[in-house]
């Protein structure tokens, strides 16, 4: 029997967007165990408990890490794309190197995964390995004056995702079916996005398996605890003036709800658990450490801690504001206000990590009859389409020439009284014209290709 007590928000745990007084950007708390729980019989001595892989820096192979209940010799059989297999042996708890003569890399355009069969004593499991690297570096062949970009397997990629909060109208944080996880990813891919930003929630691993299979990049947020440091109205001033505040003094910790050492330790334990859980998935290319200063503290130290846990992925250390100068990006949020160029003095890749949020309530597909929350409201689909075309063509796309290397449109679907989704909350209606969104995203990629990036 499994029992869980999860008081929100008074339990001191990381709670995400759940609230006991929902409204605006805070949503109804989900009661009970909302994720996957299962039991399975395992051999007493030889049980394999975890398999993960890590791509070699030169992309000519990967290491397999196997954990087992007891020290054991491990055999790894790898199916090759051209047919046949290769087999290697090693010890549980140690890296087992797999060399590949003609590696087929995982990428959004070719999300190939190697099939693994791993055995130790009486136990045998199947797994996958996506061979890919991600880093920040110069755009190959571009003018040296261009800002650096995200390189997937050495090729410059513009990371273009919507914000994905993972809520459903009848079940809250729990997807109604496995197909619902795949549906959202497919719907966004069909609109021209190449990934999603999984916002303040760690999904079931089924979600990441679908993203691996579909070639959708995932920006994964760390689940927040503590408290927001500013109100919504204050955040508008912060966006307009680009105000920055520290996060190490006692007063900063108090404002962020992090005065309790136990609360901070819980956050860091959960951070390590998230990295451990999602490490096997090639789709996850970036971690978001803090969002809009919610519970933000000691960002520079925690960025170092996160890199020690996972040196293979990128980090958006402070998404939105209160940038401490670290991380892999200059990351900003911009709602309602006109999009602006990043300053020349900050040469980090510019990541517009939230923007858009255009609202359209669809009769018969909204949460309830109460007031709507959002940033820019429209009365009909034509007005929404016109606004999106103007936003992309006159503001977003021109930023590529000035260092834009990633962007996150808010958002995949409506959530409760927030009506700014590309889809309605029930996922029954695509609100903007699908062909228009596909065209706008194609123009965005074309602008990036014009400076040397991958189309």
Language-model regions, residue ranges each:
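Secreted/periplasmic carbohydrate-active enzymes, especially glycoside hydrolases
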Residues: 1-210, 214-218, 270, 285-286, ...
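Substrate-binding/catalytic cleft of secreted carbohydrate-active enzymes
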Residues: 186-187, 195-440, 447-454
